[in-house]
Amino acid sequence: MDDRGRRCCTHSGVIALDIEAKWQNAWDRDGIFVPKMDGRKKFMITVPWPYTNGSLHVGHGRTYTLGDIIARYKRSRNYNVLFPMGFHQSGTPILAFSERIRAGDRSTIDLYTSYLKEYGEKDIDALIESFKDPKNIADYFSNAIINDFKHLGYSIDWTRRFTSADEFYQKFVQWQFRRLNEKGLVKQGRYPILYSLEDDNAVGEDDIKDGDTDKVTIEEYTAIFFRGKSFDLIAASLRPETIYGITNIWVNPDVKYVKVKISGRMAVVSEECSTKLKFQGNEIEVAGEASVQEIQKQTYTTPAGKEVKVYQADFVDPDNGTGIVYSVPSHSVYDYVYYRKKRGKDFPVIIEAPMKMKDIESKYDLETEEGREEATKDLYRNEFYYGKLVDSGPYTGMTVREAREAVKRDLISSGNAFTFYETSRHAVTRSGSKVIVAVLPDQWFLDYSQPWLKDLGHTMINTMTMHPEVYRNVMNDAIDWLKERPCARRRGLGTRLPFDDRWVIESLSDSTIYPAVYTNSIPLRSLYETGKLDDDAITRIFMNGEPKNEDESEAKRQFEYWYPVDIRLTAIPHISNHLSFYVLNHAAIFPKEKWPAGLIISGLVVSNGAKISKSKGNVVSLLEIAKKYSADIYRLYVAVQADISSTMDWNETDLASITRRFNEFKDLMAGFKQDTSDLTFEEAWFVARFSVRLRQFMESMDRYQIRDAYINIFYGVLNDLRYLSSRGGDVNRALTPVIADWLRALMPVIPHHAEEYWHSYVSDTYVSVDPFDENFQDRYERTVRRFGMTCDQMYSAMDYVEKVLQDVKNIMQVTGIEPKSVEITVANADVVRAAQEFLNNSVSGQSKKYMQYLAKRRKDIMIYGFDEYDVLQRNQVYLSKQIGCPVRIERGDVINGKIALPGKPVIYIS
C-alpha cells in the first residue's frame, strides 16, 4: 500500500464541517487517491469524460458513481487503482451556446443564469458576459463538475486531468489521425452527414439534443417523380417496391408547397424540402409557390404508367421527406386509415405476406396515433422479412428485400427517381438549431467498413470482460453495422485535422483513445511546454523506440504500467457511437496487449418513471443531490435501486425507504461500544453469518453485481443484527470482531460515513485505502471454533434451528393444538451412521434395521456437519419462548413408528 494510505489523519487537522465535507477535505489534503507505481496488481477504470456546456444531473451521476464504487472496491482488495478524469471541450454545442449569448438570445441567457444561481454565484451578469467566449463556458463548468464530483465523494486522481482543448492533448489527437491515415482509414469524398442549419456545420450525437438516448440516424429515401402536365410531383419513400400498389397521392392542405427546377424538370415539393434539396448537392431553383388547389387540378403518371389523382390528408408532414406522400393502402397503415375514409376499401395488394391489413386492423387501435405507429412497425417488419411481390411487373416473385434494391436502382437509372436523405426523427442541436441531412462533396470521414478492422474489433470484443454478457453480441452487431463516419467539421472547438487545417476533428472522433493520455498526462504536458512533443516522441512513448529524455522515459514507464484500461464503464446509449469508436480506434492504433480489457454497460436513468428533462420538471442536479439528500444516501441509492443493466428510477418513494435504513445504520453506529468479552452462541452465529456474507459480497463485486453485493452486506447485515437482538444477543459484542471488515465493505458505497466510523472505532488510517486482509476467513473461523463448528456450519446451524421451529409451528397450525410441552427427538448416532451408509450404498448389518424407514424417507435425509442435539440444546430457551411452552430435546431412533432422521427430527406436541 502507498504510505499515503497509512498516514494518520488527526481530527484537529481536518476542517470541522459535516461528515461528508470533513472527509472530502481530508482525502483531498492528503492526496490518498493519487496512485504511484508499485508492485501491486494495477487496476485502471475510466468513465466517459463529461461534456462541459452545463451542469450534470442525477442521470449522469449514476455512471460516475458506479465507476467510483468499483474503483473503491478494488482498492479494498489491495489493487493499485487509477481512476482518472478529464473534460470534453470539443464540438459545436459550447460554441453555439456562446454565440447565442453574444446574440442576446433570452432562452439561452435564462438557462445559464439558472445554472449559475444553482451554484450560488453572486455576480451572474459578469459571468454571463464572460460566456461570450466559449472557452469560459468550458472552463467554468469543468471546475463546477470537479466540485460536484468531490461533493459526491468520488475517489478521482485529479492530478492527471486534462481537456480536449489542451494543446498537448491535441498534439496526441493529430498523431492518432496521422496513424489512422497511414492505415488507409481517413478518407475524403461526397458523404451525407447530419447538419445544423443555423450553425452551418456538421453535427454528431454529442451535439444533438437527446442524441445519446434518442438516436438520430440518416435514412436513405427514394424520391420518385410523378409526371404531370404542367409540373411533376416528387414523393419520397423508404419502400420504393410498393410503387405498383399506388392508389393516389396525398398532400397536406395546410402546407406551403413550392415549384422547383431540378434535373431539368419543374416539380413540386414542400418549402422545407426545397431547403434540404439544396444542402444535398442538388442544383435547384425555386420558381414560386404551388397551391394545393393547383396541385389537385391535374392527374399524375407513375413510373409504371398508372394515372393517379391527388387527395388531401393532414397526416402529411412537410418536414419529412418531400411533404408529399404516394398512397399504398394495402401496405401502409396511415394510407389505409385515410384512404378508406375517402374512397372505401377497394385497393390493390402487391405484397403477399403472413400479416394482412385486416390482421393489423383487428390487432391495433388504428384510431390512435400510438396504435398506428405500432401497427406500422409490425406490418413493415412482417413484409420485409416474409413478403413477396405480386402484380408488380418485372419484380413479381421477388422478395421484398430483393425488390426494394432492384426497384430503387431501376428508378434512379431511368431518371424517374433520385436518392434523398432524411433524419430518422425531427432533431435540433443542444442549442436549438434545426438538424437536417446535408451532402458535402469534400467531407472527411473515418472508414470503419474495412474488413481487417472489423475482424480486430470482433476479436477484442470476444476476448474482453463484458458485463452484462448480453451486450457482447450487441457490441459485435454495432461493429458490423458501422461504416463510414464523418470525422471533421468546418467549425467548432477542437483539434485541427493535421493534413487539412480548414477542418476541425469532430467531438466523437477526438475522444476515442484519450484514456491512454491519463496514464502519463503530466510528463506529456511537460514535453509540450518544453517544445519536445512531436509525432516521433509520441510514437516512442506509446509505441516503439527508446525514449530520448527523462520526460519521455517517465511517460513511457507510466503508460506501460497502467495501460490498458481494465474496465470502461458507460451507459447503453453509447454502444453505437462512443463504444464502437473506442473499440475500433484501439484496434487500429494499439497492439493487442494494450487493448481495453473490459466493458461495463449500464442501463438508463429515469425520474419518477419519466425521462429526465427540464420540461417535465424532474431534473435533479448533482449539486442539489449533495446538498439536499447527502452524497452517501445517493450513492447507496445508485448501488441498490437497480442492477447495473436495468433502468434506474430516481423517485422519492424508494429514496425514503433507503434513507430509513441508512438512518438505522447511523443510529447503530452512533450507539456502538466495543466489547471484546466472549461471544455467546448467537453472537458467534452472527460472526459466522457475516463471514459468509462477506465472502458472498466479494464474489458478487468481483462479478460487478453491485446491487446483489450491497443488498447482502448492508441490508442483510442490518437484518441479521435485528434477528440477533431478538435472540437476546449483544449487538456491540457481536459487531466488535467484524466492524472493521464491515466498514471496509461499506466504504465503496457510503465512503464518508464509513470513514467517520472507521476513525471512531477502528484506526487512524483511511479506510478508503486500507485493504481487506485476504486471510479474513481464518480469523472468523478461529472466532467460532470454540463452539466446535466452522463458519459455514454455524451459519447452517441457525438455519436448522429456524427450520425445526417452523416445523413445530406448522404442526400447531394444522392440528390446532395449544401445546403444553414439546419434545424434539433428533437422530441418535446409530441412525446417523445408518443414514450415511444408506446414502453411500454400503449398509452394515447393524444398520439394516433402519433401512425400511430410510428408503421411504430418502429425500428428507440431511446430514449436517454439526451435532443437532447440541445445537438445539443451546437454543432450547429460544425455542421455548417462540413456541410458548417448555421444550425438551432428546436423542433417539424410532418413536411411535416414526424415525428421527438426520436433519428431520421427530416432533411430539402435548
From Swiss-Prot:
A motif ('HIGH' region) lies at residues 50-60. The keyword Nucleotide-binding applies. A motif ('KMSKS' region) lies at residues 611-615. Its EC number is 6.1.1.4. It catalyses: tRNA(Leu) + L-leucine + ATP = L-leucyl-tRNA(Leu) + AMP + diphosphate. The keyword Transferase does not apply. One of its GO terms (cellular component) is cytoplasm. ATP binds at residue 614. SUPFAM superfamilies: Anticodon-binding domain of a subclass of class I aminoacyl-tRNA synthetases, Nucleotidylyl transferase, ValRS/IleRS/LeuRS editing domain. This is Leucine--tRNA ligase. GO terms for molecular function: aminoacyl-tRNA deacylase activity; ATP binding; leucine-tRNA ligase activity. Signal peptide: none annotated. GO terms for biological process: leucyl-tRNA aminoacylation. NCBIfam families: leuS_arch, PRK12300.1. Keywords: Aminoacyl-tRNA synthetase, ATP-binding, Cytoplasm, Ligase, Nucleotide-binding, Protein biosynthesis. Belongs to the class-I aminoacyl-tRNA synthetase family. It comes from Thermoplasma acidophilum (strain ATCC 25905 / DSM 1728 / JCM 9062 / NBRC 15155 / AMRC-C165). PROSITE patterns: AA_TRNA_LIGASE_I. It is found in: Cytoplasm. InterPro entries: aa-tRNA-synth_I_CS, aa-tRNA-synth_Ia, Leu-tRNA-lgase_arc, Leu-tRNA-synth_Ia_arc/euk, M/V/L/I-tRNA-synth_anticd-bd, Rossmann-like_a/b/a_fold, tRNAsynth_Ia_anticodon-bd, Val/Leu/Ile-tRNA-synth_edit.
